[in-house]
Amino acid sequence: MIGPSDPLPGDPFTERRSRMIKAMKFVSIPVRDQQRALEFYTTKLGFRVVTDQPFSGEQRWIELGVGRSGTGITLFTPPGHEERVGTFTGISFVADDVKATWRELAAKGVVFIQEPKEEGWGTSAIFADPDGNQFVLGSG
């Protein structure tokens, strides 16, 4: 059986597709204090450290793994982009049970901007990190 990413027999675009974008490696979350952010994301959200090493100036390159996702998260603010800290990121995390996850995270001190709400597509909530960056927590 052929899957959605398998080349079709006789497909003239097979070679070209093999050079195209295949995955997302990481997204960056702008933070003011990398150590405080690292503690929040690992102790409260349960993310794992993939890389933590010196990078540029006083900053470190901190990359975190999230569950089974192949996409990592970096806690990094490029110089000159400090205005991005504390914004709505557009990043959405998935939980099997949004309400149970909301209760667990709230008990750990995670601040929720919006409590779980039933939508036509599922359940969602919005939470913030210590810098005010906002994220959606949604059902699969």
Name each model feature, range by range.
Residues 11-38, 88-91:
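N-terminal beta-strand motif that seeds the catalytic metal site of vicinal oxygen chelate
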